[in-house]
Amino acid sequence: MSEDKPEGATHLQNEKPPDEEIEPEELLEVAARALSARASLPDPTDQILLSPNYTSGWPAGAPEGVTIHTEEGWHDPSVAWLRNPKSFASAHFCIRRDGKIVQLVWERDRAWHARSSGMYYFGIEHEGGSGLGDVPILWKTGRNADDLRDDDHMLIQSARLVAYLCTKHDIRIQHDFERPPVRDSVSHIAGHDQMMGNDHQDPGPEFPWRAYMRRVERFANM
């Protein structure tokens, strides 16, 4: 894909995804993922539905972090839109409210999920909204984050995925709770609202960052 394709996320629409089968070389990628997982945490991905919207490879020094998004919509139409070439948008992963993790872009490639700083970060979308629009928040309050035993399946699986990515790719498990733009902070796990060069506000002020980061750290140390 060309470098000048837009990389900003858009409002997600209910579009039919392109028909697509996993090619033989992509099966090799799945095998490589399994081998890599032996040296890191288990890969928690449940399903692979590849998007054509990506840029091959990463810039030097990347990936260096993870961006947390909300879909501002529902899971199935969101995944469909991010797999539609007309959207010029994608994410590495989308997580459904019940915790199902769908991968859209290989870890070796760049997804189109945030302008500027996004080219250095993995992108993870979460079903529902940020609380700043018409789409409701679908995560829970983050209670019992220390023992990982509450019913917030989406954010528990999200934390598990982030811990996997951080341990595999040597990304620091760190979030700047003062919330400055990511290039002015030490956040390696950041909200979309912290990405430089964009005007998005997700995951919103109600996102339970402290509980979420405790979960990521717990999973990384299991």
How would you name each of these model-derived features?
Residues M1-S117:
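N-terminal catalytic cores of peptidoglycan-degrading enzymes
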Residues S2-T45, V135-M222:
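Basic/polar, cationic surfaces and motifs that engage anionic cell-wall
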Residues G65, Y121-G123, H188-A190:
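Structural preference for beta-strand elements that scaffold enzyme active sites
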Residues W74, S130-L132, G197:
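Feature marks short, surface-exposed loop/turn motifs that line or immediately flank catalytic pockets
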Residues R115-D134:
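Short coil-to-beta-strand
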